[in-house]
Amino acid sequence: MATCAEILRSEFPEIDGQVFDYVTGVLHSGSADFESVDDLVEAVGELLQEVSGDSKDDAGIRAVCQRMYNTLRLAEPQSQGNSQVLLDAPIQLSKITENYDCGTKLPGLLKREQSSTVNAKKLEKAEARLKAKQEKRSEKDTLKTSNPLVLEEASASQAGSRKESRLESSGKNKSYDVRIENFDVSFGDRVLLAGADVNLAWGRRYGLVGRNGLGKTTLLKMLATRSLRVPAHISLLHVEQEVAEDDTPALQSVLESDSVREDLLRRERELSAHIAAGRVEGSEAAELAEIYAKLEEIEADKAPARASVILAGLGFTPKMQQQPTREFSGGWRMRLALARALFARPDLLLLDEPTNMLDVRAILWLENYLQTWPSTILVVSHDRNFLNAIAADIIHLHSQRLDGYRGDFETFIKSKQERLLNQQREYEAQQQYRQHIQVFIDRFRYNANRASQVQSKLKMLEKLPELKPVDKESEVVMKFPDGFEKFSPPILQLDEVDFYYDPKHVIFSRLSVSADLESRICVVGENGAGKSTMLKLLLGDLAPVRGIRHAHRNLKIGYFSQHHVEQLDLNVSAVELLARKFPGRPEEEYRHQLGRYGISGELAMRPVASLSGGQKSRVAFAQMTMPCPNFYILDEPTNHLDMETIEALGRALNNFRGGVILVSHDERFIRLVCRELWVCEGGGVTRVEGGFDQYRALLQEQFRREGFL
């Protein structure tokens, strides 16, 4: 029987070589995805119609596709040459093309010298349809999520294991460990990981750490979309997008995340309706009994209580649990997405900065809850205390690779320093040894009597492993300009202030607070207690209903909003952003200002939209400090910042000569900066004399009373 390639050549003798290669590639690599001739027609039919011109109609194209489909099906049992082959290592196409001088150019990227007979747009559409079909198939076995993930620029390549592939295809792979070896991850033209390995043992809790912009979030997305090969029998959930707005009550939304329970209950209702109508069959009665047994096995009757406990821990009151999801803000819907993931209990839970959406109380509850988590967790977090509480292992992303460490974050810091020290010693020792041998070679290179010894030394050098110098991460330095004159109190105060949006729901009653240029005030409290509202009253953005706001005439406030990204123009570069905000200054001044916060070189010229969350925050800091304020009001400034930048921010605030009031949920950052702790609750603000230790103890006691501990 003719092969697919022979069929194409005979039916389309004028076919362009590039199109021929593309079509045969689709046929061989996607043969397993073609369940019928319709699938094959959908994948390549439009292209073949374009190639044929007027020589074949739709029926003719379909007949050709039918022949090729039959060939593929018959070739499946014995074919070796046309099946997919797992590579021993990733292949970089750019490296391959460097070796060819024949002038071949990639389609769609370079203009061809000769004209093509194929419509490029149709070629792209065909590729997109095939890719969408493959992605849809790979996602069938994942748990239900509120929204699909979309990756437009990220890509991955991975060396395959024939043994693991055979186990997976045979259905005999029962391990819940995730082992991915020798893989690359790129974002656009940037290589984020090269030849990396990741091993996630079943039941372990992993913290993924690294500097902003290195690819932590991209790695999670690659795992979530199975662009990196995760065994199909392992269920996974990635908490990334907030729950959709609709009329579903919050509690019901959480219950629906358990697809197994929902499917059993739906089938149970159908069978019960048949029985009630007297239309039951013998097999249905047996099926109903089996469903009841499965529901009992998964403790379906206890599910509402378990979902309610999770929601309560994340701050949802009984009343809020019955509210439709459309009535919640984006932050609360993100909490709801986290609650759904915790309730569904996937085999692999992927969390990206889960503490960003939570207040201190909810973070402490989540720490306690995750410590008894039965399956595997991989969490990206820059909250040092949170990682110390929940992580049993740390994965460090740096220098385009992943290094694993046993223990919590503090253990990781010590182990990393020891590893770097040992690597540096080993490198220096080898350099000295190499130099010693090289001196001998140089001295006796032209001495005939020593020729054999020189050759021996040269072979020794060749056999030495090539050690690279230790790649040390640069220190993060931040500095807030403070070239201003000090002035005497009162600086900023609220006196007997009442505030509300609706008289039925008073937020503050008789609020009196004050701050000066020596203040380092940290504000904590549950979400919705009024923390951000109080900051806006201090800023003067909101006017008190009653009472007085007093601000010194020389006071110049710099404000950092927790929604700072919404205030940035994402379509321009960071340099252009500052130039529009503060026109008339030389470009070097904008670059210098951005460089203070780690946005330098090509980063400063890239569109802000292409920067990571932490890099966007740094741009916002550069913009905020450009006018040289003497007082800062910061609302969740550590969100999206890496740990090194958080430490640098804390040091910069401590060295700043002006005043600071900030809202934060990051325990370490609060301890680093705070001299005074305010708690927003019950329509007022309470000063906690014992600082964060006292506040944490109060929350733990509250958990015990409520039965969370």
UniProtKB/Swiss-Prot annotation:
Keyword annotations: Acetylation, Antiviral defense, ATP-binding, Nucleotide-binding, Phosphoprotein, Repeat
Molecular function in Gene Ontology: ATP binding; ATP hydrolysis activity
Q: Which InterPro entries match?
A: AAA+_ATPase, ABC_tran_Xtn, ABC_transporter-like_ATP-bd, ABC_transporter-like_CS, ABCF_EF3_subfamily, P-loop_NTPase
Q: Ranges for the ABC transporter domain?
A: 178-424, 492-707
Q: What is this protein called?
A: ATP-binding cassette sub-family F member 3
Residue segments, region Disordered: 129-171
Binding locations of ATP 2: G525, E526, N527, G528, A529, G530, K531, S532
* GO biological processes: defense response to virus
| Binding positions (ATP 1) | G210, R211, N212, G213, L214, G215, K216, T217
Residue ranges, compositional bias (Basic and acidic residues): 129-143, 161-171
Q: Which PROSITE patterns match?
A: ABC_TRANSPORTER_1, ABC_TRANSPORTER_2
Role:
Displays an antiviral effect against flaviviruses in the presence of OAS1B.
> What is the superkingdom listed in this entry's lineage?
Eukaryota
Query: Which organism is the protein's source?
Result: Pongo abelii (Sumatran orangutan)
**Sites bearing N-acetylalanine, chain numbering:** A2
Question: What is an example of a Pfam family matching this protein?
Answer: ABC_tran_Xtn
